[in-house]
């Protein structure tokens, strides 16, 4: 769950419920609290919704304001991510030291039968790397407009997997489940190429929660998934680049 959006929702609920009669409600707000149990008046509830959507620049978004706080936070996260990654995020492939076009040669050295680009964006590597499949839930230039969690059910293995700034958001557990699904799809002897931007907040994406990747985190994941952390580099902008290799 996106902790930034969760905090925003809680703070706005506390403002909307800032009356003595709601003291018991506000003191017990948590992600499993349901809107139906709050007893908030229709006028205050409508104002709360308007404030959230205006703050997040999602005025036209349709949200089901019912059920748990967590379910509403997840809806807001999906709507905001769709807008941000589909309309705002414009990567400049040429500027990345280790995972720009230089990555093409690294992948080709493997002579891969199949390559998966996770969070491919505009699918820029499609024409440069043979046998590449690009997936991205937010961009219709991808081969399949799905998340890695959905795509992991396919009966297919890839000799190389690219994840450039895509497995980089929300909590440690969110990272873990996505990495686990990538690992399931990676063929024996294959490699996963990562770029992550720990703590680098996009100026136009204040509600995107960036995960704090580090060497220690990458090392621990390699150990957990029985992979080799083959390479770990960092550029002058604190972006981190690393390669996981699966034993043959």
Where are these regions (language model features)?
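Thiotemplate assembly-line natural product biosynthesis machinery
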Residues: 1-27
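Phosphopantetheinylated carrier protein domains
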Residues: 42-67
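Class I (Rossmann-like) S-adenosyl-L-methionine-dependent methyltransferase catalytic domain
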Residues: 65-67, 77-152, 191-248
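A short glycine-rich, Lys/Arg-flanked "PGG" loop and its adjoining helix->strand segment in the class I
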Residues: 176-188
């Amino acid at each position: 769950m996106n902790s930034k959006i969760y905090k925003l929702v809680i703070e706005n609920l506390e403002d909307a419920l800032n009356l003595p009669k709601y003291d018991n409600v506000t003191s017990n707000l948590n992600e499993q609290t349901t809107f139906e149990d709050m007893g908030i008046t229709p006028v205050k509830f409508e104002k709360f919704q308007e404030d959230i959507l205006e703050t997040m620049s999602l005025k036209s978004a349709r949200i089901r304001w019912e059920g748990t706080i967590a379910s509403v936070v997840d809806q807001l996260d999906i709507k905001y991510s769709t807008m941000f990654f589909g309309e705002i995020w414009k990567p400049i492939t040429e500027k990345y030291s280790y995972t720009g076009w230089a990555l093409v040669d690294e992948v080709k050295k493997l002579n891969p039968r199949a390559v998966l680009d996770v969070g491919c964006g505009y699918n820029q590597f499609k024409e440069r790397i043979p046998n590449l499949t690009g997936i991205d839930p937010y961009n219709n230039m991808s081969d399949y407009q799905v998340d890695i969690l959905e795509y992991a059910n396919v009966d297919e293995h890839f000799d190389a997997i690219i994840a450039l700034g895509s497995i980089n958001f929300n909590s440690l557990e969110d990272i873990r489940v996505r990495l686990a699904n990538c690992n399931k799809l990676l063929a024996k002897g294959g490699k996963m190429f990562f770029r992550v931007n720990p703590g680098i907040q996009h100026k136009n994406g204040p509600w995107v929660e960036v995960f704090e990747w580090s060497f220690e985190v990458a090392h621990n994941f390699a150990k957990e998934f029985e992979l080799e952390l083959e390479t770990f580099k960092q550029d002058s902008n604190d972006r981190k680049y690393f390669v996981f290799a699966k034993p043959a």
